[in-house]
Amino acid sequence: MNAGDVYRLIQDIRAEFGTTKKIWIYTGHIFEELTGAAKQAALASDVVVDGPFIAAKKDFRLAFRGSSNQRIIDVKRTLDAQKIIELNV
């Protein structure tokens, strides 16, 4: 599935459920570097897990991410603060 498809899927979920469903996406890319449809999809979601999975940084104790370089970003709070706000999970 490409980023444009993901963005349209998020729009469909929002149309059907409003904000009653939390939408998480995993990008494999750095949040600040996203462009185009990938950026649209990220900004339309509630939480973004960014950064590539790096096997050398794998940590099974981490919740919702595979390696310690990945961030769990609260999108709304990040947009409001105009800086990255990570969720502590």
Region locations from a protein language model:
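Structural recognition of alpha->loop->beta junctions
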Residues: G36-K57
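Residue-level detector of flexible, active-site-proximal loop/helix-junction positions
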Residues: I30, A55, L79
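Short, conserved loop/helix-junction motifs that constitute active-site signature segments
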Residues: G18, Q40-L43, G66
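Gly/Ser/Thr-rich helix-start
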Residues: H29, P52, S67
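P-loop/Walker A phosphate-binding loop and immediately adjacent motor/lid segment at beta-alpha junctions
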Residues: M1-R14, K58-V89
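Proline-centered loop/turn at the N-terminus of a beta-strand
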Residues: K21-K22, V47, R71
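Conserved Radical SAM active-site core
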Residues: M1-I25, H29-A38
